[in-house]
């Protein structure tokens, strides 16, 4: 997080009206795998107990993910490693968010009146796909239910991608670390080098490339 609060960020829950999408991302920090964003519009019977995905147990998160996708409108945007290395991780995250909102709007047959985004930045002016009114909320995944739901869907979606990828590259420990730079992952990078799913624009991966 930057040291200053940008003009497009607030620190409290807004009084949004009309059709409101919540948006959050998963996977900005890992050394491998895509960045994933989800957009969610809550249904009338949305699941109770929504919270920041990082505060939930894996079991509870999986149950909520299934319930959200059954009772709410949702869309997912996935930006792969090649685009991350081309755009940088911020640009890739903004693109994933844009794709998620675009996908959900297409499902619903109409645009949202407002998009609430976890964090301190919106894709407005940062991604050419973005065309919706948006508000960034610092800590929004813990205070705005639609964002909480999006954080859960994004996290579970990305975890499934990395669990599948771990079958092809078991040495890197992706079943447990999901691509983050744990000691096991860094040691595997040193021994085996980067895979096609590694982010070569990230320093620990780039350093291993230099020595191979």
Swiss-Prot record:
InterPro entries, alphabetically?
Answer: RNase_HII, RNase_HII/HIII, RNase_HII/HIII_dom, RNaseH-like_sf, RNaseH_sf
Cofactor notes: Manganese or magnesium. Binds 1 divalent metal ion per monomer in the absence of substrate. May bind a second metal ion after substrate binding.
- Please tell me which top-level EC class this enzyme sits in: hydrolase
A Pfam family matched by this chain, by name?
Answer: RNase_HII
The protein's name is Ribonuclease HII
Whether Glycosyltransferase counts among this entry's keywords is: no
Swiss-Prot/TrEMBL cofactor(s): Mn(2+); Mg(2+)
Q: Which domain of life is it from?
A: Bacteria
Q: Does the keyword Disulfide bond apply?
A: no
Q: What is the catalytic activity of this protein?
A: Endonucleolytic cleavage to 5'-phosphomonoester
GO terms for CC? cytoplasm; ribonuclease H2 complex
Which pairs of Cys residues are joined through disulfide bonds in the record? Answer: none
């Amino acid at each position: 997080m930057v040291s200053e609060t940008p003009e497009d960020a607030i620190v409290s829950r807004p009084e949004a009206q009309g059709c409101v999408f919540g948006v959050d991302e998963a996977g900005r920090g890992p050394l491998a795998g895509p960045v994933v964003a989800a957009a969610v519009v809550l249904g009338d019977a949305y699941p109770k107990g929504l919270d920041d995905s990082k505060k939930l147990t894996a079991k509870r998160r999986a149950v909520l993910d299934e319930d959200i996708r059954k009772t709410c409108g949702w869309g997912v945007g996935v930006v792969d490693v090649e685009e991350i290395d081309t755009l940088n991780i911020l640009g890739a995250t903004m693109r994933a968010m844009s794709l998620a909102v675009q996908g959900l709007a297409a499902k619903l047959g109409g645009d949202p009146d407002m998009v609430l985004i976890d964090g301190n930045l919106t894709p407005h002016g940062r991604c050419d796909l973005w065309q919706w009114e948006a508000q960034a909320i610092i800590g929004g995944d813990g205070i705005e239910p639609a964002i909480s739901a999006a954080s859960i869907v994004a996290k579970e979606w990305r975890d499934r991608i990395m669990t599948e990828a771990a079958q092809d590259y078991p040495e890197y420990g992706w079943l447990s670390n999901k691509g983050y730079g744990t000691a096991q992952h860094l040691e595997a990078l040193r021994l085996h080098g980067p895979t096609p799913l590694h982010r070569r624009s990230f320093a620990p991966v780039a350093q291993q490339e230099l020595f191979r």
